[in-house]
Structure formats: C-alpha cells, structure tokens
UniProtKB/Swiss-Prot annotation:
Entries under PROSITE patterns matching the protein: RIBOSOMAL_L16_1 (PS00586), RIBOSOMAL_L16_2 (PS00701)
Subunit structure: Part of the 50S ribosomal subunit.
Keyword Transmembrane: no
Protein name: Large ribosomal subunit protein uL16c
One Gene Ontology term from the biological process aspect of the record: mitochondrial translation
Organism: Phalaenopsis aphrodite subsp. formosana (Moth orchid)
Keyword Ribonucleoprotein (UniProt): yes
UniProt GO cellular component terms: chloroplast; mitochondrial large ribosomal subunit
Classification via InterPro entries: Ribosomal_uL16, Ribosomal_uL16_bact-type, Ribosomal_uL16_CS, Ribosomal_uL16_dom, Ribosomal_uL16_sf
Length: 135
C-alpha cells in the first residue's frame, strides 16, 4: 500500500475540503481517466483496491497511472479510553481529494475496456466519479 517514506511531522490537523481542485484536474499521461465529483478522504487501501481491479480487468494490455498519493496521516484513539491524554497514534494514510481531481489514468486499451475498468474502480471509491477522455 502507498504511504510516505518519511514525513516532517507524525500527526496533522484534519483540515477542510472546500472548493474545487485547482491541481491535478487535467489528463497528463494516459488517454482515459477517472475524475472525482465530490470531496473526500480516499484511503491507501481504497486506492490500491481500485488499482488492482483495473489491472486485473485490463489484463496485460494497457498502462495505469495513479494520480493521487496518500500523504495525510489519520490518527485513531484506542477503544474504551478516556478523553484527554493527547492525540491518538497514526493509524492509516489518506489522500485529500476535491471535486475535479483525476484519480486514475489509463492508456493502451480500447475505450470500452477502459470504461469498464474505470467503472469497477469507481465502485471501490467512496465518492461519485466520472469517466473522462482526453482531447
């Protein structure tokens, strides 16, 4: 699963997801792409599940690019602990995705295969997405 090799700080604030994505909202590498329509945190597990599903469907043909990276640690407190005594420990990593952000890109396959593969990957995502073609 994806995670940063090292970070400056172990824990981060939760932050806010307002507005639309101003970066990573154009197709750069492939011909087809999956674009987010809603804001959300997408976990490293969800990214990996979508990537695997697309790879399996496309078989040998095609190349896949993952355009998001989980660089935000999410802390979780142990169950049945009292309030106070600091913040919980980092449990998993998420990528902050805003509307318009490209999640996956694909090329080297037909449009029908790419669309079907992207739909399978979209089912693994916690948000609504759309299939985009470059050009």
């Amino acid at each position: 699963m994806l995670s940063p090799k090292r970070t400056r700080f172990r824990k981060q604030h939760r932050g806010r997801m307002k507005g639309i994505s101003c970066r990573g909202n154009h197709i750069c590498f492939g011909r087809y792409a999956l674009q987010a329509l809603e804001p959300a945190w997408i976990t490293a597990r969800q990214i990996e599940a979508g990537r695997r599903a697309m790879t399996r469907y496309a078989r040998r043909g095609g190349k896949i690019w993952v355009r998001i990276f989980p660089d935000k640690p999410v802390t979780v407190r142990p169950t049945e602990t009292r309030m106070g005594s600091g913040k919980g420990s980092p449990e998993y990593w998420v990528s902050v995705v805003k509307p318009g952000r490209i999640i996956y890109e694909m090329s080297g396959v037909s449009e029908a295969v790419a669309k079907a593969a992207m739909e399978i990957a979209a089912c693994k995502m916690p948000i609504r997405t759309q299939f985009v073609i470059s050009g």
